[in-house]
Amino acid sequence: MLDKSQLSADIAKSNQDAEIAKFDALAQEWRDPNGKFKHVLAFNSTRLMAIENAIAVHFQRDLNQDIPFQGLNILDIGCGVGLLCEPLASQGADVTGIDASGHNITLAQRHAQKWSIKVDYKHCLAQDLIGNEPQYDVVLNTEVIEHVDDQQLLVDTCCRLLKPSGLLVMATLNRTLKSYIVGIIGAEYIMKYLPKGTHDWNYFVKPQEITSMIAPHGLETITVEGMSFNPLTGQWKITDKPDVNYLLYALKTTD
């Protein structure tokens, strides 16, 4: 006699295995330097290097050490598939990555498990962490604010989650004519690096606006770095011109 419960269990397990395999493949695809996300990976590589250097300078750490960020608690808000979380965790930091997309968190978790990298991934919003009042040495908010309606709330939350003397890193796009031409017309319509409609120029944020938003929380902007893309080489570099993509670093001076 056919055991329908066993059959259902076998089908469920088969479906689950297929889903796991799909997520594993997607997680790996996100890290293929020659795959469809190669432009994102090139951008992330330069951004990561800049962030690592900023953390090392701020906390007086030597990047030549095996685990230079040991003892630091880092929060990545809008972590995506963990492109920043994993390398920072591999350098000794205790990393928490949160994202509003459960799909992203699943991909990140699968990849971290595969390579035995310890990251605490959570499917939640930044505001969801406020009740427990955890505080972090470093709070990262990269390429998120330009997609958020209540930008002030997001910045307020970032500041509240940061320890005194901690480092806030905000990465986004400046609201300039050049950013419209390069970041939207060029990236989305001409070069097609991003899907059309990825960005709304009206949501881009000027560095001085972030500086004003963080000031009531006792944060001061330390420096602002620009990021520039060379379409001929496909490479990004750090510049002193934050007129399109930029990174803003801020110090929390008070409780």
Residue ranges with predicted function:
Residues 1-37:
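N-terminal, positively charged/glycine-rich alpha-helical extensions of SAM-dependent methyltransferases
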Residues 42-70:
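Conserved alpha-helix/loop element of class I SAM-dependent methyltransferases that forms part
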Residues 55, 59, 112, 214:
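Conserved hydrophobic residues forming the short capping helix/wall of the S-adenosyl-L-methionine
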Residues 62-177, 207, 248-252:
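Conserved SAM-binding loop
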Residues 169-191:
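Conserved class I S-adenosyl-L-methionine
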Residues 192-209:
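Acceptor-substrate binding/catalytic loop of class I
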Residues 219-230:
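Conserved S-adenosyl-L-methionine
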Residues 235-255:
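Core SAM-dependent methyltransferase catalytic element
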